[in-house]
């Protein structure tokens, strides 16, 4: 009996702990939801005539907060409180989310986030959840415009002025209201662009997907700000005081010149972020967008601390993320190996510490200092976390000037290696890389489906290599892995791109994988009507790679917002407490004591406190986080298996595996190649009706916008008219578009 007491006690303890954890998570979810809903409802109720003004007057006069503190409490504190609670939620949740059949619904059901409602147009593919969000914002804007219009008309009736002055007054109050709506848009503007945002991790929306929300909000915000400025300019022209007023810088009240500077910076960012400019002149867009610093600082000088506190919460979270990214990106990262495939695609294997965690659908930002110290480019990770603890791989397609320079740099390395110049470190070309990330989904959602359809266009196959590797490793090691049927649909232009298949060796990862995973790969070569002689073996060719010397022995830094939950939570909480403390102490011991009343100066002090709190309090956490990284990295490195030059952990297959590898299914057994045609997704989805039955099917698309639109349109049509015994397809996009 004694032999069974410990396991039983352990099981009871684990069950009790699970109940406590679930209860705490449920409580935190309820509290965060209540705070968010209350905050949004309160913002909507601020517009009626007297309610908002009366509340602000009451709180600011009856408490120690004052006007600035009251505005900060109403508009910014809810975001910061939700962020703090979100960090606690993620700490309690743990590192990994395991999907099992018990957690998955037995019957297919619609999901708001994966059902495409709009599949074409200016918004691209829009899910039902996103469509609801657009509707809520639309109602919010219409309601605010309506409420402010009523207030403007009521205000005009109170003043008996000449018709000319009446027009000027109407323009000025309209401009004031439009500026206020623009500020309310800015409350949300910086939340999606924070790459390691705790809020994005909470709702499991990756940064590459959230950027579209930033784009939408940016257009709306700048539209309101532009109309705001236009109303005032027209009014000043009517008065004949344009030059006099536009260069005024008032000590008390709104400082106009800083507002003009902020608006000009915003307009430059807005114009260069339009799709045509961004696509054809990305560097112009990228460098111009650094004017966000001018935009924010001069906005604070324009409106002062009182109004700037409305948008302070989102901007503060962005500054937190930006500082952490700066700290991570200062470290140079070793390139373990580099390889060029026949199709021109480059593969880089980068060194990473064993304690860095990421999901198969992650991506990184890469800088190569020999090419540019300013340019950072996003690339999907092609390796699985289970491929090895010490490396991460990316595939880079040569498309523009930066990637062409990288290809030339690798060519120089090949030549230097062939000429035996690598013996002299001073003579051979170098590749000095810096990395930000990894970023991506908080949970590996590809493991949430028993049935997967992976649709790729060209280099979009890269993240699917990571997915396949992740699934195969889990099947081989007996880990929790829900997917059992995977269909890969890959459209490419030429057969040269088949060489990308050499990036993953499926039989060597999981011998006899066909007994554990039903895998089909359908390849469509659109610009060739028939195969070339070498096409049958191109995927088997192993191309030589350059082994680069470990110049500094450095791997990627774990100082990332998506990294360790405890440290990222401490970074957020301590920095937030430090910011509020600095603002409070500054108000008590400086502003009130010395009777500081200049609006623009108080706005500058407010921004200074935001930056200083991140540098001082956040920097202190970063120092200890960095020390923890070194200690845990050394411990894990000593306890891990050795790594070969390609960055892969040594794996010794058994005799049965070796025999299996010799007679294992060839790639042709699960790969079908079609020439001169494009994927017919309606036929593909209909063919799965009888094969898979009534199940949930996760469809992940990585490719150009036209591919996403085509797939989303077929999924929407199939989902609406599907029979009860047919699969329900869930649309997921994994395409990155800045």
From Swiss-Prot:
Expressed in shoots and leaves. Detected in cotyledons, stems, siliques, flowers, sepals, anther filaments and stigmas, but not in roots. Its EC number is 1.16.1.7. Residues 1-29, 91-122, 237-287, 356-564, 626-738 are cytoplasmic. It is a multi-pass membrane protein. Keywords: Cell membrane, Electron transport, FAD, Flavoprotein, Heme, Ion transport, Iron, Membrane, Metal-binding, NAD, Oxidoreductase, Transmembrane, Transmembrane helix, Transport. InterPro entries: Cyt_b245_heavy_chain, FAD-bd_8, FAD-bd_FR_type, Fe3_Rdtase_TM_dom, Fe_red_NAD-bd_6, FNR_nucleotide-bd, RBOH/FRE, Riboflavin_synthase-like_b-brl. FAD binds at residues 377-380. GO terms for molecular function: ferric-chelate reductase activity; metal ion binding. Heme binds at residues 214, 228, 289, 302. Induction: Down-regulated in shoots by copper deficiency. Not regulated by iron availability. Light dependent expression. It holds the Pfam family NAD_binding_6. The keyword Transmembrane helix applies. Gene3D superfamilies: Nucleotide-binding domain of ferredoxin-NADP reductase (FNR) module. It comes from the Eukaryota. Residues 50-71, 147-212, 313-334, 588-602 are extracellular. CDD domains: NOX_Duox_like_FAD_NADP. Coiled coil: none annotated. The chain crosses the membrane at residues 30-49, 72-90, 123-146, 213-236, 288-312, 335-355, 565-587, 603-625. Its cofactor is FAD. One of its GO terms (biological process) is monoatomic ion transport. NAD(+) binds at residues 437-440. It is found in: Cell membrane. Belongs to the ferric reductase (FRE) family. Ferric chelate reductase involved in iron uptake by shoot and leaf cells. May participate in the transport of electrons to a Fe(3+) ion via FAD and heme intermediates. This is Ferric reduction oxidase 6.
């Amino acid at each position: 009996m004694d032999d069974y007491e410990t396991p039983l006690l352990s099981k009871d303890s684990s069950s009790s702990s699970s109940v406590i954890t679930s209860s705490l998570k449920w409580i935190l979810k309820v509290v965060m939801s209540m705070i968010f809903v209350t905050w949004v409802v309160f913002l909507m109720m601020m517009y009626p005539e007297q309610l908002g003004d009366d509340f602000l007057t009451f709180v600011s006069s009856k408490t120690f907060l004052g006007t600035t503190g009251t505005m900060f409490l109403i508009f910014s504190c809810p975001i910061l409180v939700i962020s703090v609670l979100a960090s606690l939620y993620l700490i309690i949740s743990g590192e990994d989310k395991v999907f099992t059949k018990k957690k998955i619904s037995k019957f297919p059901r619609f999901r708001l986030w994966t059902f495409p409602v709009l599949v074409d147009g200016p918004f691209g593919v829009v899910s039902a959840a996103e469509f609801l969000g657009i509707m809520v914002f639309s109602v919010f804007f219409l309601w605010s415009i309506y409420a402010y219009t009523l207030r403007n008309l009521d205000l005009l009736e109170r003043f008996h002025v000449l018709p000319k002055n009446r027009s000027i007054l109407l323009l000025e109050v309209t401009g004031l209201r439009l500026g206020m709506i623009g500020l309310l848009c800015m409350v949300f503007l910086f939340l999606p662009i924070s790459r390691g945002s705790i809020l994005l991790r909470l709702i499991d929306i990756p940064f590459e997907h959230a950027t579209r929300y930033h784009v939408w909000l940016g257009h709306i915000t700048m539209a309101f700000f532009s109309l705001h400025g236009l109303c005032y300019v027209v009014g000043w022209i009517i008065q004949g005081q344009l030059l006099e007023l536009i260069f005024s810088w008032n000590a008390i009240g709104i400082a106009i010149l800083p507002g003009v500077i902020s608006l000009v910076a915003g307009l430059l960012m807005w114009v260069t972020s339009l799709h045509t400019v961004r696509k054809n002149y990305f560097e112009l867009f990228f460098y111009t967008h650094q004017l966000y610093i001018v935009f924010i600082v001069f906005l604070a000088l324009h409106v002062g601390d009182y109004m700037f506190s409305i948008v302070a919460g989102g901007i503060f979270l962005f500054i937190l993320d930006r500082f952490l990214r700066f700290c991570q990106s200062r470290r140079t990262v070793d390139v373990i190996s580099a390889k060029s495939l026949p199709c021109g695609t480059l593969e880089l294997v980068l060194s990473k510490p064993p304690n860095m965690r990421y999901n198969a659908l992650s991506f990184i930002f890469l800088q190569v200092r020999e090419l540019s110290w300013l340019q950072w480019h996003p690339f999907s990770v092609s390796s699985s976390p289970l491929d090895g603890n010490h490396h991460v791989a990316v595939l880079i397609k040569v498309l523009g000037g930066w990637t062409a320079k990288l290809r030339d740099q690798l060519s120089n390395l090949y030549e230097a290696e062939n000429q035996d110049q690598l013996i002299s470190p001073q003579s051979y070309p170098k590749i000095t890389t810096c990395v930000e990330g990894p970023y991506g989904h908080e949970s590996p959602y590809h493991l949430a489906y028993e049935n997967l359809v992976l649709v790729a266009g060209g280099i979009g196959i890269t993240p699917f290599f990571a997915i396949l590797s992740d699934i195969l490793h889990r099947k081989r090691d007996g880990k929790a892995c829900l997917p059992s049927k995977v269909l890969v649909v890959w459209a490419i232009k030429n057969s040269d791109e088949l060489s990308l298949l050499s990036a993953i060796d499926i039989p060597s990862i999981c011998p006899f994988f066909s007994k554990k995973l039903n895998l089909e790969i359908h390849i469509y070569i659109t610009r060739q009507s028939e195969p070339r002689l070498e096409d049958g073996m191109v995927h088997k060719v192993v191309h030589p790679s350059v082994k680069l010397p470990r110049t500094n022995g450095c791997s990627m830094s774990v100082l990332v917002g998506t990294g360790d939950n405890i440290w990222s939570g401490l970074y957020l909480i301590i920095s937030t407490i430090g910011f509020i403390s600095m603002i409070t102490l500054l108000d008590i011991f400086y502003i009130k004591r010395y009777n500081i009343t200049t609006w623009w100066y108080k706005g500058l002090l407010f921004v200074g406190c935001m930056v200083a709190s991140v540098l001082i309090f956040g920097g202190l956490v970063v120092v200890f986080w960095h020390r923890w990284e070194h200690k845990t990295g050394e411990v894990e490195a000593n306890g891990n298996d050795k790594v070969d030059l390609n960055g892969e952990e040594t794996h010794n297959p058994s005799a049965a595996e070796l025999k299996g590898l010799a007679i294992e299914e060839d790639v042709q057994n699960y790969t079908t190649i079609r020439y001169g045609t494009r994927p017919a997704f309606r036929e593909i989805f209909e063919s799965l009706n009888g094969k898979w039955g009534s199940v949930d099917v996760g469809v992940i698309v990585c490719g150009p916008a036209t591919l996403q639109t085509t797939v989303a349109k077929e999924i929407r049509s199939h989902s609406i008219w599907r029979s009860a015994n047919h699969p329900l397809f869930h649309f997921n996009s994994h395409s990155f578009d800045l």
